[in-house]
């Protein structure tokens, strides 16, 4: 978020025209005492990479942060739960136009949109899911549903699975659902 807010800082950290040591020093000065050692290690690694643009740097950091949360969920054997909850949240938002507008409204503060989401789902989902859903509200480039879909794609990669969305005219019975899963697993 700091790199998104502080465009000059982001440009300086991603500027491949300057020495990697200078970029490293900048990262140390700004972040050393404010982030976890793992986060600091990731930020240090960014200073040695070549970035097409400052936005490419922030997108990469965002993806790595999402991966870290999802890896933690996988290690705790909660990845399927988190992915399922994210999918249902996305469907909930997609299915209600007023909610879609409220969560995506650029005239509302990010904090307000996150509070709305927390009020709706906070006590119904895992901590990891809530963290990711609140993070998905931050994006100004994509809709909430698009961001969550990206998170679901990362979750599927981590689980070494493919995703399939099946739409039916009526609710499936347990037997039909089992048969569908069997067919999709082929």
Question: Which residue stretches match the model-derived regions?
Answer:
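Elongated, mostly alpha-helical coiled-coil "stalk/stator" tethers of large membrane protein machines
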Residues: 1-186
């Amino acid at each position: 978020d700091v790199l998104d807010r502080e465009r000059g800082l982001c440009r300086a950290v991603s500027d491949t025209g300057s020495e990697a040591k200078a970029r490293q020093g900048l990262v140390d000065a700004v972040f050393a005492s404010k982030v976890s050692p793992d986060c600091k290690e990731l930020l240090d690694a960014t200073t040695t990479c070549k970035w097409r643009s400052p936005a490419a740097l922030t997108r990469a950091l965002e993806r790595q942060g999402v991966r870290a949360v999802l890896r933690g969920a996988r290690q705790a054997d909660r990845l399927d739960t988190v992915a399922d909850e994210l999918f249902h949240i996305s469907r909930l938002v997609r299915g209600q136009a007023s909610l879609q507008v409220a969560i995506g409204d650029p005239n509302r503060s990010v904090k307000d949109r996150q509070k709305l989401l927390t009020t709706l789902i906070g006590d119904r989902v895992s901590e990891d899911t809530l963290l990711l859903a609140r993070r998905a509200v931050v994006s100004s480039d994509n809709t909430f549903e698009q961001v969550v879909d990206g998170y679901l794609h990362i979750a599927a990669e981590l689980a070494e699975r493919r995703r399939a969305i099946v739409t039916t005219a009526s609710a499936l019975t347990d037997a039909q659902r089992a048969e569908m899963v069997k067919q999709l697993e082929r």
